[in-house]
């Protein structure tokens, strides 16, 4: 009789461990996609004082952070590095290039957003989008 109880407890414990393992695997594999990133205006030309608005969306786990980087002439400059206090399915944020110290001409704008999933050892899924932009500091004549 003691052996039956011991075996039942052992099987119950193994079942509990397997269920917990299955749940952990589900959590890791439930959200494999990074956030959607949209930018407005998306014209390719911009002035330093023009506000650029980002809309970041991740319905499953919410948006955790965004980093905006400018690449020009083999140099990189981070314009915005923001971690949202509360991950939400949709986040919006704005920035401009007023304090970037850029001159007229072409540059690449890179936006990387991360969600609040457990992927990448807790860093979340990431999405990186790049736009070729043209900075125009001269007012229209």
Task: List the predicted regions and their residue ranges.
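Conserved structural position at the C-terminal beta-strand
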Residues: 56, 111-115
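Aromatic sugar-binding surface patches on proteins
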Residues: 85-96
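Proline/serine/threonine-rich low-complexity linkers at boundaries of modular beta-sandwich domains
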Residues: 21-37, 123, 129-141
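Surface-exposed, short loops/turns at beta-strand junctions within beta-sandwich domains
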Residues: 99-106
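N-terminal Sec-pathway targeting helices
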Residues: 2-17
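Contiguous beta-strand segments within globular domains
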Residues: 42-55, 63-65
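Short, solvent-exposed loop/turn segments at the edges of extracellular beta-sandwich modules
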Residues: 114-123
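Solvent-exposed loop/turn segments flanking beta-strands in beta-repeat/beta-sandwich domains
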Residues: 58-73
């Amino acid at each position: 009789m003691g052996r039956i109880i011991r075996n039942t407890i052992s099987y119950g414990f193994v079942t509990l461990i397997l269920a917990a393992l299955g749940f952990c695997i589900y959590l890791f594999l439930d959200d494999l996609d990074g956030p959607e990133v949209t930018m407005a205006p998306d014209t390719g030309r911009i002035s330093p004082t023009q506000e650029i608005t980002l809309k970041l969306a991740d319905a499953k786990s919410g948006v955790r952070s965004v980093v905006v980087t400018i690449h020009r002439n083999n140099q990189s400059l981070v314009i915005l590095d923001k971690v949202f206090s509360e991950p939400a399915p949709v986040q919006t944020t704005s920035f401009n290039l007023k304090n970037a110290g850029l001159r007229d001409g072409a540059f690449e704008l890179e936006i990387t957003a991360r969600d609040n999933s457990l992927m990448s050892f807790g860093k979340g899924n990431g999405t990186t989008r790049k736009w070729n932009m043209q900075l125009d500091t001269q007012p229209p004549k």
